Amino acid sequence: QFKRRAKYKREPVSLTLALLLGGLTMGGIAAGVGTGTTALVATQQFQQLQAAMHDDLKKVEKSITNLEKSLTSLSEVVLQNRRGLDLLFLKEGGLCAALKEECCFYADHTGLVRDSMAKLRERLSQRQKLFESQQGWFEGLFNKSPWFTTLISTIMGPLIILLLILLFGPCILNRLVQFIKDRISVVQALVLTQQYHQLKSIDPEKVESRE
């Protein structure tokens, strides 16, 4: 009778392990989907941010370069007008003498701006080449076809997890079942030993006197 009870107890244990393994499988697939999607979205957002910063720096460089050209053109116009006014007031000793004011002199610092913009363009070019060299084939494929790479990265993780479970799941399940069987056998032996000691401790004379 005890062996039958032990046999009935093993079936729910195996069923529980199967359900547990199935739950771990589904949980692993869900976790793989979530992890792959999150990593892909984070990488895409980082690349978009980097590209946006690169474009903004290019626009700033172009704007400052245009301002430098405009300032250079304006200074040429001002100097040309100054020379013309000096010729008109040549008899009075020039424009400053006619106005009886100190003469203003033009200090050209556009060369520093021009050099800074040239260095900025060079750094932007180097950064763009470095970014393209570090970009892998998967990222290049993502830039060409985002939906396809999203599908691949989403499915790849769960497929790998499912393949690992199919390869190692039966072995692990058999080990767990064997371990539980061994534990049940030990418990069964302990129970039988305890019952044997209880029967052995009973005095036969007391049993006969009761009868």
Curated annotation (Swiss-Prot):
The annotated region (Fusion peptide) lies at 13-33
Naming one, the record's GO cellular component terms include: membrane
Q: List site positions: Cleavage.
A: R10, E11, L190, V191
Q: Where is the lipid attached (S-palmitoyl cysteine)?
A: C171
Which Gene3D superfamilies does the annotation name? 1.10.287.210
Extracellular-facing ranges: 1-151
Which first-to-last residue range defines the signal peptide?
none
> Where along the sequence does the record place the motif called YXXL motif?
196-199
- The answer to whether keyword Transmembrane applies is yes
What residue ranges lie in the Cytoplasmic compartment? Answer: 173-211
State the residue spans of region: Immunosuppression: 79-95
InterPro entries in alphabetical order? TLV/ENV_coat_polyprotein
Query: Where do the coiled-coil regions begin and end?
Result: 41-90, 100-136
Q: Assembly and partners?
A: The mature envelope protein (Env) consists of a trimer of SU-TM heterodimers attached by a labile interchain disulfide bond.
Q: What is known of its domains?
A: The YXXL motif is involved in determining the exact site of viral release at the surface of infected mononuclear cells and promotes endocytosis. The 17 amino acids long immunosuppressive region is present in many retroviral envelope proteins. Synthetic peptides derived from this relatively conserved sequence inhibit immune function in vitro and in vivo.
User: Could you tell me what this protein does?
Assistant: The surface protein (SU) attaches the virus to the host cell by binding to its receptor. This interaction triggers the refolding of the transmembrane protein (TM) and is thought to activate its fusogenic potential by unmasking its fusion peptide. Fusion occurs at the host cell plasma membrane. The transmembrane protein (TM) acts as a class I viral fusion protein. Under the current model, the protein has at least 3 conformational states: pre-fusion native state, pre-hairpin intermediate state, and post-fusion hairpin state. During viral and target cell membrane fusion, the coiled coil regions (heptad repeats) assume a trimer-of-hairpins structure, positioning the fusion peptide in close proximity to the C-terminal region of the ectodomain. The formation of this structure appears to drive apposition and subsequent fusion of viral and target cell membranes.
- UniProt-recorded name of the protein: Envelope glycoprotein
Natural source organism? FBJ murine osteosarcoma virus (FBJ-MSV)
Q: Where is the organism placed in the taxonomic lineage, from the top?
A: Viruses, Riboviria, Pararnavirae, Artverviricota, Revtraviricetes
Name of encoding gene: env
